[in-house]
Amino acid sequence: MRRNFETFIEHGLAIERNRDAAMELLTISHSYDALAGADLVFEAAAEDLNVKHAIYAAVEAVVDADTPIASTTSSIPVDDLCAGMQHPERMLVAHPFQPVHIQPLVELVGGSCTAQSALERTYELLIALDRKVVRLKKSVPGFVVNRLAQAMFRESLYMIEQGVADAADIDLAVRYAVGMRYASIGLLEYFDDVGFDLEKAIAQTVYPDLCAVDSVQQIVQDGIAAGNTGRRAGLGLYDWSKKDDADYLRRKTAPFLNDIHWKLPE
């Protein structure tokens, strides 16, 4: 948290007094007893049901019966998370996105076990924290954001494999067309703007040629087999030894830093 504040200070979004005041509000404990009286509990453990279930049992032993427990999982359904709980109606998913301390979006997902009151209570708290909340009507693998992302990843990798364009040119198209457009208007707002009739004509031409595979592309399988798994390995779709990593990290956080307007403690 202190390191994250250094980024805010560097960009003129906070001063040292804000950092110090925020740190004073933070309590770190190794005991579940510290959760007694909590309004909401977030669980951000490894994606292992055994680990999560053990945590829920410990949390339920100290919090009120109606205190929501929100998992930050990106993949495990709520109905699997709540199995064996004393009060499964409290269980839900509140899935944030990296970098969590500055990315405003949270996906809020319930299951067949989840009480509407738990969802509403969590929603109200997230809104009070200036989050942008996507409320799913039902749970599906990948929720909303990762389904959209995987659709784009799949088509992008397919175009590389088919020799349509390379990674750099596809990223150029995303950054200066798709990304810029949908940063200020919604995808489906634009669909309505274009109109159903024109979108139908485009779809009839493009849909039959889109990637429809339901397995991981060979380019990914080959990269894993060779140890070329991306940025951390130094080689993936890009040769990262030829890229400015510090510049990449700055660009990765810049859009979110520009949107910060929090009232910070003093």
What is each of the regions a protein language model found here?
Residues 128, 149-155:
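Structural/interface elements that position substrates and couple domains in central-metabolism enzymes
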